[in-house]
Amino acid sequence: MAQVARETKVATQVAVMNEASKATRLLTEWIAAGVIGQVREAHNWSQRPYWPQGIERPKDPEPVPDGLDWDLWLGPAPARPYNHVYLPFVWRGWFDFGVGAIGDMGNYSFDTMFRALKLASPVRVDASSTPRFPETYPVGSLIHWEFPAREDRAPVTLHWYDGDLRPPRPAELEPDEHMSDVEDGEGMLLVGERGKILCGFEGQNARLIPAGRMKAFEPPPDDLPKSPGAYEEWIGAIRGGESPRASFEFEQKVVEAVLLGSIAVRMGTTLEWDAEHERIKRVAEGRAGDLEIANAQINPPRRAPWELA
């Protein structure tokens, strides 16, 4: 889709909204100004999933509800009898329909981190989790992406936690300080060579830790270009203006990382990624056939008549 958008010069936008937020812009300015030095680690944690995961396929079919075209709802996914465990909303936890917690929320927070840290394609992705199941994502998972040096930026490792998992509490926090957002229990932590930034899940309410450093902090100039707003960017692009910041071309790399993370969770190991050829080139501790199984998940087969030409 990103390639077609480039070739046709069609305006595109992914509705993540972070690209237009003050929080993302300020975090990007702090990192660019070297407030905490070169960032070597980024941590991002979510309370999700709050839908069922780590379950088996139900054995007993149920009557299809009136008004639901079950075959149409399945689309390209393999056929199966109807059961309420698949919809609505709860489809997120199933391999054939969703991408688990990382797919549900990673597109938002990763948008912020990809901008602030100038990230592109990872070279390696590793995952571990609670017990794995044949068709659903686990209850909790840890995913780690290794990104190489970019322009003037050092290599960085991005760590994701879901299922109520989170990184160790920073020693810089006072006992009465909250590590996670008090409303949703989620957060983001950027670790640099000269300090740490703690913020909400998508980069909001950023602050330096310890608190004493934040009190003495003199922010860098707020001089990055400001967005008129995500909707305004979209309308302007339709009318022939600049491409939206959250274009398919930019978000392609975000989605690539998220999907690689989900594949690593399903495989339960480390994957080495060849971004140029868009393929997994090695599966750590792989059994015979694991590399083929992992690569098949990049472009899974589609049920007729939903094939793509």
Model-derived features with residue positions:
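Rossmann-fold NAD(P)-binding glycine/threonine-rich loop
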Residues: 1-10
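Active-site Tyr-X1-5-Lys
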Residues: 4, 26-30
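Short "lid" loop at the C-terminus of a central beta-strand within the Rossmann-like core
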Residues: 18-20, 49
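Contiguous beta-strand/loop segments that form the cofactor/metal-binding neighborhood of enzyme cores
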Residues: 25-26, 37-38, 43-48, 52-249, ...
